[in-house]
Amino acid sequence: MDPLLLGSVGVLVLAVTLIIWRLLKLQWDEKAARQRTDMLLAMNEGAGGSDERRGANVAGGMRRNARRRVNRDEQEDGFVNHMMNDGEDVEDLDGGAEQFEYDEDGKKIGKRKAAKLQAKEEKRQMREYEVREREERKRREEEREKKRDEERAKEEADEKAEEERLRKEREEKERKEHEEYLAMKASFAIEEEGTDAIEGEEAENLIRDFVDYVKTNKVVNIDELSSHFGLKSEDAVNRLQHFIEEGLVQGVMDDRGKFIYISDEEFAAVAKFINQRGRVSIHEIAEQSNRLIRLETPSAAE
């Protein structure tokens, strides 16, 4: 869970608890003030009854007591009215000083007003906190959106770069294939005395026939190959080497003047054997190759 969210919930719960405590304390203070007021009123009534009894016995003392009672009643009534108007600013039953609180300017204020000001301040702080929280969430969301935009832009740039790279590779491959094609055609441009060079479709047919002959016979004698296509042995070897380099055929030339064609499947079988065995000797490779590579033409094998 988000730590900031947990902190927000904690602050909110603390603020609500503080407000409830303030309200309960205010009710308790008001109840205590009413009780003290009732007690003072009862004391005032008892004092008045005593003065009246003394006034009935002594006429001269009655007037003096009446005047004192009036003055005392006025003072006590003023004190009671003051307590009724402001329940916070009252004396304790034991004669203690009145309870006050002070605002930010140092002025004395009653507890009820102080509680209201405190609640108002807490609400203001809570609103400010909520505003800051919304602004912070908005800022984080904007940052995440900006990061997503940057990532999308980077992905698009990478895709374009990859497409451009593939396009260049494709163009380069097509160019090389075309050059190889032209080179192969040139290799079969057989010139004879009194005749023109063989070009076009006829040269392509000669290339195809040459490659098919090697693949079909599997083990090709160079002399037979040169005789079959009307070439010198050296030219036949050169052209065979050229086709090997171009990837049209693949195989090995032995020291007896024979070329052994190896198919893709046979190459894969030998590579699989090496990968499975791990470290192998040349003798083991040669022995396994003799078993995996077919040295007979399909017709001879049948």
Curated annotation (Swiss-Prot):
Residues 101-178 are annotated as: Disordered. One of its GO terms (cellular component) is endoplasmic reticulum membrane. Its main location: endoplasmic reticulum. Disulfide bonds: none annotated. Keywords: Endoplasmic reticulum, Membrane, Transmembrane, Transmembrane helix, Ubl conjugation pathway. It is a single-pass membrane protein. The keyword Membrane applies. GO terms for molecular function: ubiquitin-like protein ligase binding. It is found in: Endoplasmic reticulum membrane. Residues 22-302 are cytoplasmic. The keyword Transmembrane applies. InterPro entries: DDRGK_dom-contain (IPR019153), DDRGK_domain-containing (IPR050899), WH-like_DNA-bd_sf (IPR036388), WH_DNA-bd_sf (IPR036390). The chain crosses the membrane at residues 1-21. Residues 118-178 have a biased composition (Basic and acidic residues). Substrate adapter for ufmylation, the covalent attachment of the ubiquitin-like modifier ufm-1 to substrate proteins. Belongs to the DDRGK1 family. This is DDRGK domain-containing protein 1. It comes from Caenorhabditis elegans. The gene is ufbp-1.
